[in-house]
Amino acid sequence: MAKMIPSLVSLILIGLVAIASAAVIFEERFDDGWENRWVKSEWKKDDNTAGEWKHTAGNWSGDANDKGIQTSEDYRFYAISAEFPEFSNKDKTLVFQFSVKHEQKLDCGGGYMKLLSGDVDQKKFGGDTPYSIMFGPDICGYSTKKVHAILTYNEANHLIKKDVPCETDQLTHVYTFILRPDATYSILIDNVEKQTGSLYSDWDLLPPKKIKDPSAKKPEDWDEQEYISDPEDKKPDGYDDIPKEIPDTDSKKPEDWDDEEDGEWTAPTIPNPEYMGEWKPKQIKNPNYKGKWEAPLIDNPDFKDDPELYVFPKLKYVGLELWQVKSGSLFDNVLICDDPDYAKKLADETWGKLKDAEKAAFDEAEKKNEEEESKDAPAESDAEDEPEDDEGGDDSDSESKAEETKSVDSEETSEKDATAHDEL
């Protein structure tokens, strides 16, 4: 037992050293002084559509002192960024993580963040500013509820080809993107892996390694017909003599039928139960079937591997650039590092520690809202006691027309919102 104790101590020390050696490139918890580290962009200020950020813990939280930054104005563009020492992830794991809470029942707006490279004029940072990585949730209507993972390669933005659903409730969630030197990646939500794979297969960063041989031709004797008619199956004798319809033997000539005036009476016809339709031989498996022919794959002459496909050599800024129809998205605990374990630890210490208390605060807020709404709603007895007269009817018609107008305006606004979102 005594011999085991030093070994156990050694393992603990090794673990502590590993954590201590984790390189934290950028970590922001939005405590006091955060405004000195972040630059608010002047993008969209000239046309008065730039939104203001609010430093707050939100309307419900697990800790009122644990604040982030929140969008505060509807129908606004938001842009803010922070600089960190230039960093390359060559031969290192890149971890990009942050938390976001959509308090506003978000129906159209982004919740993603960006990593930028090179030199950027932060005062002009906006939708047209080139970025290296864009990652995080995006919601717009019923069709878009996903996690973006967009990588820039050779000055082109490439979207992930896999679908990664995002969270859509009004609570805080942690989004993590991990990019490794072996060109593999993982996407986590609340410390749970939701997607993983390779840069080679899940983005179209490079031409495919293999392509179909354009010179290949299908052999003339290649049989793609899976089923054939049974040559042993023969049509029964007299099959074609079976009529499709037969006289209805149960029908009787009407008593008032006059052959001289009405003509000779004939019984109506009914479908013949013995009629089987056009005869066709039964189908059997084709013994010569070879399957659907496909051209063989060959090496793509246009493919050139890039061993540094995963590398972003001059990462220098992290930013938020959003369009929001309804404001209320709150961002916090932004992390850029090279150690997934440290990122998990940070998420556990922040989101994990407070999520139950936040859920309780949210439930309490919802309960209060329901109580307030029930107080404002007219009692049924009061509604029944109200006199019904012509003037009341006119008012009702006016209110109905007003509501119809609001509905039309709302539909038109939703269409405009979706259009603005798609243009981002």
From Swiss-Prot:
Keywords: Calcium, Chaperone, Disulfide bond, Endoplasmic reticulum, Glycoprotein, Lectin, Metal-binding, Phosphoprotein, Repeat, Signal, Zinc. Residues 194-259 are annotated as: 4 X approximate repeats. Residues 1-22 form the signal peptide. The modification Phosphoserine is found at residues 381, 396. Glycans are attached at residue 59. A motif (Prevents secretion from ER) lies at residues 421-424. GO terms for molecular function: calcium ion binding; carbohydrate binding; unfolded protein binding. Residues 210-279, 362-424 are annotated as: Disordered. One of its GO terms (cellular component) is mitochondrion. An alpha-D-glucoside binds at residues 112, 114, 131, 138, 321. GO terms for biological process: protein folding; response to endoplasmic reticulum stress. Molecular calcium-binding chaperone promoting folding, oligomeric assembly and quality control in the ER via the calreticulin/calnexin cycle. This lectin may interact transiently with almost all of the monoglucosylated glycoproteins that are synthesized in the ER. PANTHER family: CALRETICULIN AND CALNEXIN, CALRETICULIN-2. Belongs to the calreticulin family. This is Calreticulin-2. It comes from Arabidopsis thaliana (Mouse-ear cress).
